[in-house]
Amino acid sequence: MDIFKKIEREQMRLDIPSFKSGDTIKVYFRIVEGEKERIQVFQGNVIRIHRGTTNATITVRKISDGVGVERIVPLHSPLVDHIEVVSEGRVRRSRLYYLRNLRGNAARIKPKKIY
């Protein structure tokens, strides 16, 4: 059992910033097309965090042209270049699935007040 934990620790990334549900983040994906490589940015609200060792994931939701788009991001994937926290949100839940049914200004997350 100890061998598995050692291998998982070697595969984990250490450059992931701390964030929580409700925060707005930018995820920079490394896209390989043929021999070319480019970076694609996905910015949205974190609606779910699944914690784990190497299988930790987050679900990020954004509205694109009036359509809700959700993307499940494996945190320790080599295809994720880096993650950047844009702003912190004030929510009282850890899973924000209720945002899927809200439209317009009701779907906004209030910014966290820093005193």
From Swiss-Prot:
It holds the Pfam family Ribosomal_L19. This protein is located at the 30S-50S ribosomal subunit interface and may play a role in the structure and function of the aminoacyl-tRNA binding site. GO terms for biological process: translation. NCBIfam families: rplS_bact. Keywords: Ribonucleoprotein, Ribosomal protein. The gene is rplS. This is Large ribosomal subunit protein bL19. Belongs to the bacterial ribosomal protein bL19 family. PROSITE patterns: RIBOSOMAL_L19. GO terms for molecular function: structural constituent of ribosome. It comes from the Bacteria.
